[in-house]
Curated annotation (Swiss-Prot):
Protein name: 3-ketoacyl-CoA thiolase
Xref: CDD domains: thiolase (cd00751)
GO CC terms: cytosol
Gene3D superfamilies assigned to the protein according to its UniProt record, in alphabetical order: 3.40.47.10
Molecular function GO labels: acetyl-CoA C-acyltransferase activity
Family assignment from sequence similarity: Belongs to the thiolase-like superfamily. Thiolase family.
Catalytic reaction list: an acyl-CoA + acetyl-CoA = a 3-oxoacyl-CoA + CoA
Source organism of this protein record: Escherichia coli O7:K1 (strain IAI39 / ExPEC)
PANTHER family membership: ACETYL-COA ACETYLTRANSFERASE, CYTOSOLIC, ACETYL-COA C-ACYLTRANSFERASE
Record gene name: fadI
Record-listed E.C. numbers: 2.3.1.16
Active site: 99, 392, 422
Keywords: Acyltransferase, Cytoplasm, Fatty acid metabolism, Lipid degradation, Lipid metabolism, Transferase
NCBIfam families per UniProt: AcCoA-C-Actrans, FadI, PRK08963.1
Length: 436
């Protein structure tokens, strides 16, 4: 085993995760239609502070993420500080690491705590797939810049005469990788073919995710960590996630056609996570600061790791790469874990990562390790369902997973939890958390 890297301050304090909260997650263009990510972020941070009863001046830093950014609010973190009644002097900056964005926000606050520059901070993320930065064509954009510099009406008219009707069409945000042009679903199809993952296996995992998420809500396990969202026109609040299919049968999944490879594919809308709106945040402190304030932490951050691989083939293998590093830095093995929570971008991606975590060949030939990371125990894996059921507001998912895992660990009497995700650009993230 490699070097253990304890996450402690210079005084020996552990990094405490005091509390966490999220909005309900809503499918694109449903309950949060027209609500920008910055407002979702304000909503969750404001409620998190109100519930914690922590004085606003205690929070010294806010690191927040947004993947689909809006030009009018490029620093969502600072807008949240200014819009929630927090101390105006609170340091705030924004981060983006695609689907692992709130992992990055949490790591950044943890690093500030370990460096001793702060003693308490908030980390999280928000995204809206319903309020999007709809752009213009490159040709129209160039003409508009030139028109702004033109001095006479004739010069302006000459510039506009270069445009064709197609140049005036709005341009939605790209859904493909900038470097390769591949959509996420194309990569999921690659992975299904590379690792021999069948349509039936993907549908079964998706069905499992929805069943377990529906059961978690039915059992009241998510009430403490999900706020009620009051949104314009304030006629009906959103209390629960609205993507979960609690009454579906496995046979229903087989009815859908492939969404990406129409002829030979196995990835469908039902075995993929949907476009989603929502926000999530956590409060982190040094262990001693939490004690001073009389707070009992949800748990502690034990380790984290980020990785990157090539984007052309099977790029959503982040968990298989980052998990062994995070476990190594925590001084743990897979068998030491009480819970494993993996982001389900696609059922194919999830199953591929599970397969590789237990692969001796992958460990030896690709990772350069002597042994496989370890088989994933199904009884520990995504026990409350995953992103296929809950949805995936890109920047919020990591904070959701960490809060959810810590609450479940406490219900089970404590232990260690692994939280891990793939991300666009071939990125991966993993964190080990501990509850007592």
């Amino acid at each position: 085993m490699g070097q253990v890297l304890p996450l402690v301050t210079r005084q020996g304090d552990r990094i405490a995760i005091v509390s966490g909260l999220r909005t309900p997650f809503a499918r694109q263009a449903t309950a949060f239609h027209g609500i920008p990510a910055v407002d979702l972020g304000k909503m969750v941070v404001g409620e998190l502070l109100a519930r914690s009863e922590i004085p606003a001046e205690v929070i010294e830093q806010l690191v927040f993420g947004q993947v689909v950014q809006m030009p009018e609010a490029p620093n969502i973190a600072r807008e949240i500080v200014l819009g929630t009644g927090m101390n105006v002097h609170t340091d705030a900056y924004s981060v983006s690491r695609a689907c692992a964005t709130s992992f990055q926000a949490i790591a950044n606050v943890a690093e500030s705590l370990m460096a001793g520059t702060i003693r308490a901070g908030i980390a999280g993320g928000a995204d809206s797939s319903s309020v999007l930065p709809i752009g213009v064509s490159k040709k129209l954009a160039r003409v508009l810049v030139d028109v702004n510099k033109a001095r006479t009406m004739s010069q302006r008219l000459k510039l506009f005469s270069r445009l064709r009707l197609r140049d005036l069409m709005p341009v939605p945000p790209a859904v493909a990788e900038y470097s390769t042009g591949l959509r996420m679903g194309d990569t999921a199809e690659q992975m299904a073919k590379t690792y021999g993952i069948t349509r039936e296996q993907q549908d079964a995992l998706a069905h499992r995710s929805h069943q377990r998420a529906a059961q978690a809500w039915s059992d009241g396990k998510l009430k403490e960590e999900v706020m009620t969202a009051f949104i314009p026109p304030y006629k009906q609040p959103l209390v629960e996630d609205n993507n979960i299919r609690g009454n579906s049968s496995l046979a229903d999944y087989a009815k859908l056609r492939p969404a990406f490879d129409r002829k030979h594919g196995t990835v469908t809308a039902a075995n993929s996570t949907p476009l989603t709106d929502g926000a999530a945040a956590v409060i982190l402190m040094t262990e001693s600061r939490a004690k001073e304030l009389g707070l009992v932490p949800l748990g502690y951050l034990r380790s984290y790791a980020f990785t990157a691989i090539d984007v052309w083939q099977d790029m959503l293998l982040g968990p298989a790469w980052s998990t062994p590093l995070a476990l190594e830095r925590a001084g743990l093995t897979m068998s030491d874990l009480t819970l494993i929570d993996m982001h389900e971008a696609f059922a194919a991606q999830t199953l591929a990562n599970i397969q590789l975590l237990g692969s001796e060949r992958f460990a030896r030939d690709v990772l350069g390790r002597a042994h496989a990371t370890g088989e994933v125990d199904e009884s520990k894996f995504n026990v409350l369902g995953g992103s296929i059921a809950y949805g995936h507001p890109f920047a919020a998912t990591g904070a959701r997973m960490i809060t959810q895992t810590l609450h479940e660990l406490r219900r089970r009497g404590g232990g260690f939890g692994l939280v891990t995700a793939c991300a666009a650009g071939g990125l991966g993230a993993a964190m080990v958390v501990e509850a007592e």
